[in-house]
Amino acid sequence: MPYLSGLGNDLVRIQRFRRFLEAGKTAILERLFTEEERSFCLAKKDPAPHFAVRFAAKEAFLKALGTGLRYGIRWQDMAVVRNPEGKPDLVLDGEAARLFEDRGHVRLLLSCSHDGDYAFATVVFEGN
């Protein structure tokens, strides 16, 4: 029977990413986000909330995992993508995927939103 094996939340000020964009700090965005994520966000009229909510999802994942960016995890090992119905999913790769599996987690659930000045994400892990 599945059980709750991890939980993480994160809240991000959208203005933080608006400042990165206004200052042309593309190196930060390239370090934090995959090419697919950057393309998706930059295609939006206001990309800042979309970057912020993706960053919140990655931070929430790291909190649920309990590792932060240790053990070789990179920001680009985590990517927020849309499933065919439009729901955001967090896709793992590299060390993030390996640690997730090695620690006995079998399913990852993501809920995220942005409104006003903030972006928020919650990540829940299930184990067997």
UniProtKB/Swiss-Prot annotation:
One of its GO terms (molecular function) is holo-[acyl-carrier-protein] synthase activity. It is found in: Cytoplasm. InterPro entries: 4-PPantetheinyl_Trfase_dom, 4-PPantetheinyl_Trfase_dom_sf, ACPS, Ppantetheine-prot_Trfase_dom. GO terms for biological process: fatty acid biosynthetic process. It catalyses: apo-[ACP] + CoA = holo-[ACP] + adenosine 3',5'-bisphosphate + H(+). Keywords: Cytoplasm, Fatty acid biosynthesis, Fatty acid metabolism, Lipid biosynthesis, Lipid metabolism, Magnesium, Metal-binding, Transferase. Its EC number is 2.7.8.7. Transmembrane segments: none annotated. NCBIfam families: acpS (TIGR00516), pantethn_trn (TIGR00556). Belongs to the P-Pant transferase superfamily. AcpS family. HAMAP family: AcpS. This is Holo-[acyl-carrier-protein] synthase. It comes from Syntrophotalea carbinolica (strain DSM 2380 / NBRC 103641 / GraBd1) (Pelobacter carbinolicus).
